[in-house]
Amino acid sequence: MLVGIISLFPEMFKAITEFGVTGRAVKQNLLQVRCWNPRDFTHDKHKTVDDRPYGGGPGMLMMVQPLRDAIQAAKAEVGEGAKVIYLSPQGRKLDQAGVKELAQHQKLILLCGRYEGIDERLIETEVDEEWSVGDYVLTGGELPAMTLIDAVARFIPGVLGKQASADEDSFAEGLLDCPHYTRPEVLDGLAVPPVLMSGNHEEIRKWRLRQSLERTWLRRPELLESLALTDEQRKLLKQIKAEHS
């Protein structure tokens, strides 16, 4: 997968390209990340990248010319088929279904806004989709872009040591994750659930499913509303609700 980044702070993306799972994916050439800085496309000695908004009001907008030139340069280099995404609070909220959808694309260009945002006409003419990581305000689009890259990269074949990990993690099936345990067997008087040491894989699977359902129902019940539960899941959920009534 090739991801292009339009950002005034490309150095921030070292967190993605040099560390952790995504850093390893970059080293293995499973993930390519390239950056374009609008400052490199300015025409004045001060490298100005902000401008006043029409109608007044607080704050500034990203200047159209250098931003547009950076976007078009990224499109030209990344090539045809690249989806241009603007990270914006007005966008579609990123969830696991959206991550899987975006992971189907081999080329993405992520536009990171700063200041009060960008000219609406650039969104209309240069952007394919707007995506948000939540209902809150950040100082720029870089952190949302890194969140998106990290989530999407997990679905690139070969990035995770065990591909099943991407499909079994929290939200992969629309449910919260089950509890996990490692050594020691007893920690401060708290023991690992015996079923996890039983060696009975079917019982372990059922226990994990039940825990996921219970956590989801208790902590994020709205997630269950959009799921098509299996007969097994419906039966377990009925038992869980009865126990808590």
Curated annotation (Swiss-Prot):
Indicate which residues the UniProt annotation says bind S-adenosyl-L-methionine.
G113, V133, G134, D135, Y136, V137, L138
Which reaction(s) are listed as its catalytic activity?
Answer: guanosine(37) in tRNA + S-adenosyl-L-methionine = N(1)-methylguanosine(37) in tRNA + S-adenosyl-L-homocysteine + H(+)
What general EC class does the enzyme of this chain belong to? transferase
One GO biological process term: tRNA N1-guanine methylation
Q: Per the record, GO CC terms?
A: cytosol
Identify the keywords attached in UniProt to this record, alphabetized.
Cytoplasm, Methyltransferase, S-adenosyl-L-methionine, Transferase, tRNA processing
For this protein, the Enzyme Commission number is 2.1.1.228
Q: Which Pfam families does this one have?
A: tRNA_m1G_MT
Q: Which domain of life is it from?
A: Bacteria
Note whether Transferase occurs among the keywords: yes
S-adenosyl-L-methionine in keyword set:
yes
Q: Which GO terms describe its molecular function?
A: tRNA (guanine(37)-N1)-methyltransferase activity
Check the record and name the InterPro entries matching this protein. Alpha/beta_knot_MTases, tRNA_m1G_MeTrfase_C_sf, tRNA_m1G_MeTrfase_TrmD, tRNA_m1G_MTases_N, tRNA_MeTrfase_TRMD/TRM10
Q: Which Gene3D superfamilies does this entry report, sorted A to Z?
A: 3.40.1280.10, tRNA(m1g37)methyltransferase, domain 2
Q: Where in the cell is it found?
A: Cytoplasm
Predominant cellular place of this UniProt entry's protein: cytoplasm
Give the similarity note: Belongs to the RNA methyltransferase TrmD family.
Q: Kindly state the subunit structure of this protein.
A: Homodimer.
* Role: Specifically methylates guanosine-37 in various tRNAs.
State the name under which the record lists this protein: tRNA (guanine-N(1)-)-methyltransferase
Q: Which organism is it from?
A: Pasteurella multocida (strain Pm70)
Which gene is the coding source of this polypeptide chain? Answer: trmD
